[in-house]
UniProtKB/Swiss-Prot annotation:
<dbReference type="GO" id="GO:0000015">
    <property type="term" value="C:phosphopyruvate hydratase complex"/>
</dbReference>
<dbReference type="InterPro" id="IPR029017">
    <property type="entry name" value="Enolase-like_N"/>
</dbReference>
<dbReference type="GO" id="GO:0000287">
    <property type="term" value="F:magnesium ion binding"/>
</dbReference>
<comment type="pathway">
    <text>Carbohydrate degradation; glycolysis; pyruvate from D-glyceraldehyde 3-phosphate: step 4/5.</text>
</comment>
<dbReference type="Pfam" id="PF03952">
    <property type="entry name" value="Enolase_N"/>
</dbReference>
<comment type="function">
    <text>Catalyzes the reversible conversion of 2-phosphoglycerate (2-PG) into phosphoenolpyruvate (PEP). It is essential for the degradation of carbohydrates via glycolysis.</text>
</comment>
<feature type="binding site">
    <location>
        <position position="365"/>
    </location>
    <ligand>
        <name>(2R)-2-phosphoglycerate</name>
    </ligand>
</feature>
<dbReference type="GO" id="GO:0005576">
    <property type="term" value="C:extracellular region"/>
</dbReference>
<feature type="binding site">
    <location>
        <position position="336"/>
    </location>
    <ligand>
        <name>(2R)-2-phosphoglycerate</name>
    </ligand>
</feature>
<feature type="binding site">
    <location>
        <position position="387"/>
    </location>
    <ligand>
        <name>(2R)-2-phosphoglycerate</name>
    </ligand>
</feature>
<keyword id="KW-0460">Magnesium</keyword>
<keyword id="KW-0963">Cytoplasm</keyword>
<feature type="active site" description="Proton donor">
    <location>
        <position position="204"/>
    </location>
</feature>
<dbReference type="GO" id="GO:0006096">
    <property type="term" value="P:glycolytic process"/>
</dbReference>
<comment type="similarity">
    <text>Belongs to the enolase family.</text>
</comment>
<dbReference type="Pfam" id="PF00113">
    <property type="entry name" value="Enolase_C"/>
</dbReference>
<dbReference type="InterPro" id="IPR020809">
    <property type="entry name" value="Enolase_CS"/>
</dbReference>
Amino acid sequence: MTAIIDIVGREILDSRGNPTVEVDVVLEDGSFGRAAVPSGASTGAHEAVELRDGGSRYLGKGVEKAVEVVNGKIFDAIAGMDAESQLLIDQTLIDLDGSANKGNLGANAILGVSLAVAKAAAQASGLPLYRYVGGTNAHVLPVPMMNIINGGAHADNPIDFQEFMILPVGATSIREAVRYGSEVFHTLKKRLKDAGHNTNVGDEGGFAPNLKNAQAALDFIMESIEKAGFKPGEDIALGLDCAATEFFKDGNYVYEGERKTRDPKAQAKYLAKLASDYPIVTIEDGMAEDDWEGWKYLTDLIGNKCQLVGDDLFVTNSARLRDGIRLGVANSILVKVNQIGSLSETLDAVETAHKAGYTAVMSHRSGETEDSTIADLAVATNCGQIKTGSLARSDRTAKYNQLIRIEEELGKQARYAGRSALKLL
């Protein structure tokens, strides 16, 4: 009854107007699953590879080749298989690809099918996706990391860090956390406007004001938290995504906006000072993806009091994560389904992290769609944290809205992670 009888891939648009892959899976009993694949702007060198067309169409970014793979090779390989055999289906696709980085079939083709299969199987089981994937213990609503000021690769301003985030750790529910974030977001917008800055939003819905450095951005956020009636550090904590790989050149961290260069030790000490001066509880990619020595120094320096998240460092890859655990590097992993390219491998990365005492943060990409799968996966894995952009753009708010629905559906079983999500608080 849950055998796969049809798979349809198509080319749709993501939130940046670039093509991406969407996949429909139909089962023998009529159950249906649909998934759309996200795409990143700042990508790690060790990520699974998307299949893009090249040429002039869509400026080379078309995905007709990936769609052809979905409708051809992948359908031929898994047609008739039981959709409830997720691990077997994912492994079949990984083996069919045969490469280390999914470069033959394309991670965008494989992931679209993997997620759509899970959704179809969930529908066949009569269960919401978070319950189907996570089982009876899936009940923790994640603390959102809300990206409200953008810099780096996500903005055209002098700020070298990519994201400045707020975390409503003092809220009592996801519904209340979203309200906290919205009120700070709109307060920040007014304060930026009053100070003469533009308030256009970037790829992830955050503002991209022309501020001179990270401290200026943090000061604006601190003032906005207080003006909105909240206590920084108590109601709302702060987070950074440095995306340090983007400005790591010849062994140093080159801050073009500030016209400063810091060696790895100076970079770590700079981050430590920021975490001391502001209620910063999480720092993502504070060091470059292959600067293992710098990562180790940073972890030894502040890893006992600040969550240090590996994104480009780990790329949702369990093997790289195990290397980090062995070396004592970072203490958290950012989880992006398209970095690794299948649902099974994503779940394995979260499990590997949790077994080692590392936290996990479910995450979107800067190129998103209205697909809200990651909201369900955040609850399914009980990871307790989600990063899905600001309080603007429907491709971001779709995930918050889905979390609100899940919380309502869970009723008294629902628990908002709050401060407990960050083990060091």
